[in-house]
Structure formats: structure tokens, C-alpha cells
UniProtKB/Swiss-Prot annotation:
The UvrABC repair system catalyzes the recognition and processing of DNA lesions. UvrC both incises the 5' and 3' sides of the lesion. The N-terminal half is responsible for the 3' incision and the C-terminal half is responsible for the 5' incision. GO terms for cellular component: cytoplasm; excinuclease repair complex. This is UvrABC system protein C. PROSITE patterns: GIY_YIG (PS50164), UVR (PS50151), UVRC (PS50165). Interacts with UvrB in an incision complex. HAMAP family: UvrC. CDD domains: GIY-YIG_UvrC_Cho. It comes from Leptospira biflexa serovar Patoc (strain Patoc 1 / ATCC 23582 / Paris). Gene3D superfamilies: 5' to 3' exonuclease, C-terminal subdomain (1.10.150.20), GIY-YIG endonuclease (3.40.1440.10), UvrC, RNAse H endonuclease domain (3.30.420.340).
Amino acid sequence: MKDSLVLKTIQEKIKNLGSLPGCYLWKNELGQVIYVGKALKLQSRVRSYLNPNQKDRKTRALFVELYDLDWIATGTEKEALLLEATLIKKYNPKFNVRLKDDKKYPFLCVSTSEDYPMVFLTRKVKDNGDRYFGPFTDVKAARDTLELIHRIFPIRKTKLKLPLPKPQRPCLNFHMGRCLGPCQGNVTKDTYSELVDEILRFLEGKKERLVADLKKAMMDASSKMEYERAGFLKQRIEKINQLREKQTVVSMDGGDEDILGISKREDEGQILILEVRGGRLEGKKSFPLTGLSFSDDEEAFTSFLRDYYLNVTVLPSVVYLPTSAKGNYDVFLEAILEKFGTSIKLKFPEMGPKKSLLRLAEKNADLSLTERILATKLRDQTVAMKELQEKLNLPTLPRTIECYDISHFQGSLPVASGVMFVEGKPYKPGYRHYKMRGYEGINDPGMIHEVIARRLSHLVNEEEPLPDLIVIDGGLTQLSRAAEAANALDLGHIPMVGLAKKREEIYFPGEKHPYSFDQHSPMMRLLRNLRDEAHRFGVTFQRLQRKKKALKSILDDIPDIGASRRKSILMYFQAKKKVTDATRQELEKVQGIGPVLAEKIFTNIQNLKKIEPK
């Protein structure tokens, strides 16, 4: 139940809100902003969160944590939309969908504010009259595009303030025909401006119209016997056409369109844009998202459309979205119209070619998300090993780690399990099971002593390398017995720690008190993964031992099943596992087993399957 005093305090604040548009900020008990929202009428929107019987999963989860409220009134809902984006970027609230990377993506800048513009990459977009194209989520793609422009268009590449007081000597680019040489005064401002216009159309995706204009200019130059200029224009046309031939035609109407796909896994997600310009698929952009645990596709796309399209410099005419993203985007579209003087259409195709493109975008989004998750895991594994070496004062990077656990059922059939992680990942060939014999009752420390002694002795006898770190699932007592076993073999220092279950604390040999570390750190995640995997592996083996014993006991205890019939049953099914899966009809086929006996065996086996280890 939410504290009544907390609710009363919030309700008093709500009374002062009125019906103004603006943004509201929910905070937790620590004063952290956990959610930012916008509303046309703040009071009614905020009050809706205080109903404890919410149907919406996200609102229920938010209700549990909300402790305080803040707000900022705005003049219009469009202003609230823009402010919401700023506040989310500032506070990074956990219940908001947001772009995962807060880094600034690069743009291509055409410095049209200069007399003789140049094209370059930048991460800063200035309101200075220059033209910007992007953002590019792939830095390599941005560099490749810049290189392509420099290869096709003879624009200047040196950062000089032109025009110069006195002409410079021509550079290599001029001699190779890759620059018109404005630093020498070899080109008029009008001619250079025509070149810049060509680049702008190229970047806007208007390549078909650009080629048509270049062909017209080439014919005009040829008719005036300006053959050198005509030759340069012909080369430019050929290079652009070569590029267009590599691009797939996906829209016969030749429009500028963005096709958006999304992939989600728990709190993480990826939105991918397929960019169609002039009817041709020109490229893709992929954006990582987070905060998706409690959000549907409509909220995810609402946040993304706001964050992305209100920051681009060139708009497509149409944006295609999956039907799962259908919703009210009126405020966003009004903001686009106000900023750009033109709007875009949002469409949600349910069939046809555009639906196929949406599936393609979704597939690519999923591939991109998978790649990102794998890269994150690899990075976390590397960080975890480095943290372990530093925090546990290990002599070497723990590339090979082994973890040991004891499993039993109320003291009976005890087993030990050992798992091995190499480079932070499970290494199944290194997994081992051990049957513990000769123990009466529960004696985890004694069993840990035995299994460590057996494991290390085996490694020494087989001349195999020792692990870089051994983790014991248990506290001080279990760790002490494990260390005794290692010391008795006189193998020198073998790094060893114990991971206590209750508080996830780490024990060191010879020290009475445990150490606590950041539970969310890669190091602790790796140790928990080791411990959980050892436990899973041990429980699975223990379950198998119990079933084997129970099966043998069942066959022994059923009247009229002697050694001969028991042998016939096991030989007929070849494996005990198959016996437990046998039907009544299959059991009847065994020599010497009739319908009555088959029914008894079948009933006992079904009771056996209900056994679950603790």
C-alpha cells in the first residue's frame, strides 16, 4: 500500500496545477526523477496516476515507486513536447523510453554560409546558415559518404578562409581534377555555387533530377565547344549513375520515404530506419533504445519520432510504421509543421510492398539488437574479469574460473557439481559431476573439502593447468574447508573465494568478515552467473540420481517383478529414461508383462515423475 501521507501530499500539490499544458516529473523516495510526461491539462493527467487499481502495467509499477511530484507549465502542448524531450535527456528517467546513447551522432555539413563552401563532418549543429545532413548512426558510413562526395564533386577540401588576399599555389587535388581551385581564384562564385547546389541535391536524395540537370549542362557545354567542362560533367554523371545502379529500387513512385522497424527484448530495443530516396533504398540507420520494459510500440515510436525527426535537417515525405504503433501523433505532426514549414505523412500499411519493407526493417532491427547485446555481453565479460583481478587482488586475469556447489535431497543422495567459465562464458567440456558417498546427514563443508581435493589432485596427476580462480558456493565454513584441501596438496597459492547466498557477499580465505561489492557491477553479475550455473547443473544431476534410485526401487517393490522381468524391461527399452516415458501399451509388449502388471508399472512411474528436488 502506498503511504497515505505521501498520497495526501501529492494530492495537495495537484490542486495547484490547474488545466495548464506542460510537463510533469514523478520522483522516487530518493528524489530521483523516474518518469517525465507531457499533458494538455496537467491536473487531470497527473491525477490519473494515483488510482492504485491501474490496469496499465507501467502505471502500476510507477505507482509503487512514486513519492513526489514536480511540474513545469508551458504555453502550448507543442512546447510541452519539446520540453519533455529535453527533460528526458537531462534526467534519464527509468520509466521513459529513450535513446540509449547520449553521444552526439555526426552530421555532414555543407558550409553554405561561406562564399566558397566545403563539406565536412561535425557533431555540432549550429544555427549559422550552414546546411546539415544526418544524423549518421554509423561513423564509417558518414566518412564513406564524405569520401564519395569528394570523389564525385570537385569541391575544396582545405580549411581556408576564402577568398584569400593573394592566390595560393595549386594543390595536388587541383592537378588531379578533384578541386576547382577557389584558393587560386580560378573559379567564379556563380560556377562554384552551381557545384554546391549539385552536392545539396545529391545529399537530399534528388539524384535522378540532378543527373537530368547535369546531362542538360553537359549538352549545353558541348554545343558551346566547352569540351573540357563537358568531359568533367560526363564523369560526374557516370559516377552518380554507378552509385544509383548499386541501390535497390523499392518504390516506383520515386518518393522519399522512411520505413521504421522495431525489435525489443525486455528493457532493451532497437529501431531501424530504411531510407528510401528517389524510390531507391539508399541506406539504413539503427538507434538503440532503453526503458522498454513497461512500454508498448506506440509509446516507443512516439518518443523516437519526437527525438529523431525534430532534430533532422531533411524530412522524408512519408514515414511508414508497423500497425502496432498506431496512435495519436497530432502534437508531433504540429511540431514538425511549425519547425519545417511542411509536414510528413505517417502510414501504417497492413499488406503489400510497404508491409514487406516493414518486415525487412524489423528483421534488420532484430539483427542490429542481437549484435549490440552480444557486443555488450562481450564487453561486460572483459570488464568483469578485469574487475575480479583488481578487486580480489588476483595475480593474473581470471580467464578460467571454476565454481563448486553441493546438492542433496534432505541429506540423501548428495552430489557435487563443478562448472567452468572461460573468458567469462560457460565452457561445457569443463563441467564435472561428483557423487558423494559415506556421508550421514547434511555435511556441505566436508563434501566441498572432498570435491576440491579430488578435482585438484586430478589436475595435478593429468598435468593440466590449474584454474585462475575457484569460487565456492557458500560462506566462511565451506570456503575454509576448500582452502584446507588445496593447502594439503602443497600447490602454492590458488586464488579462491566464497560467495554467500544471503547477501551476495564475498569471503576470502583466512578472513572472518565478508566484503560487499556493487551488486550491479559486471564482476558480481559474472560471479552470480557462475554460482547459478553450478547450482542448476548440480540440481539437474541430483534429480537424475533420485529418479534412477526411485525407478529401481519401483521395479523392485512391484509384486511379480523379479530380477528376470526387471532385466527384460530395461533391456527392451535400452535406457531407463525410455522406461519412464513408456505408455501402458508399450509396457505390455515386454515379454512376461501383461495388462495388469503394465498398469501397475505405469502408475508407479507417473508418481515418480511428480518428484521435484528442493
